């Protein structure tokens, strides 16, 4: 008998075998452990960048939206905002209106700002946060 993660991978492989031009993933990583989530996200990214597939991803994991070309925030079935990942994910008040919390690097940016440490730009990833912290010294 397959475990949940294995079932999800088999389902993904079955869809990919059809080679559609547009892929819609609804909570594609919901039942996966962190390593499994990263593996699926890398696969989805490769499908978009290398095979030029259009990917629509529906997720409650805000970190999964960081690499998106476009982000649509939906709350109670209504779109409340749209824009680039940076435009959408660096506004804690907007995320709160959608019932979401900011990615950890964004929250750290605002916590540092409140403590008097101002960085040049709001980071989306840990790598960007590290770069901004190194630049600010």
PLM regions: where:
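Catalytic Walker B motif of ABC-type/P-loop ATPase nucleotide-binding domains
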Residues: 23-26
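Conserved catalytic motifs of ABC-family nucleotide-binding domains
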Residues: 19
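ABC ATPase "signature
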Residues: 82-83
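Helix N-cap at the start of a conserved alpha-helix in ABC-type nucleotide-binding domains
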Residues: 34-36
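Hydrophobic anchor residue at the start of the ABC signature
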Residues: 12
């Amino acid at each position: 008998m397959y475990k949940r993660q294995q079932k999800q991978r088999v389902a993904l492989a079955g869809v990919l075998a059809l080679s559609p031009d547009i892929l819609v993933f609804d909570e594609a990583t919901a039942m996966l452990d962190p390593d499994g989530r990263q593996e699926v996200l890398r696969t989805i990214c490769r499908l978009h960048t290398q095979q030029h597939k259009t990917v629509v991803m529906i997720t409650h994991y805000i970190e999964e939206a960081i690499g998106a070309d476009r982000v649509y925030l939906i709350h109670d079935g209504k779109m409340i905002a749209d824009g680039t990942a940076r435009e959408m994910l660096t506004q804690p008040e907007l995320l709160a209106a959608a019932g979401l919390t900011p990615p950890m690097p964004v929250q750290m940016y605002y916590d540092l700002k409140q403590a008097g440490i101002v960085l040049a730009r709001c980071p989306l990833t840990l790598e960007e946060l590290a770069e901004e912290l190194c630049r600010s010294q």
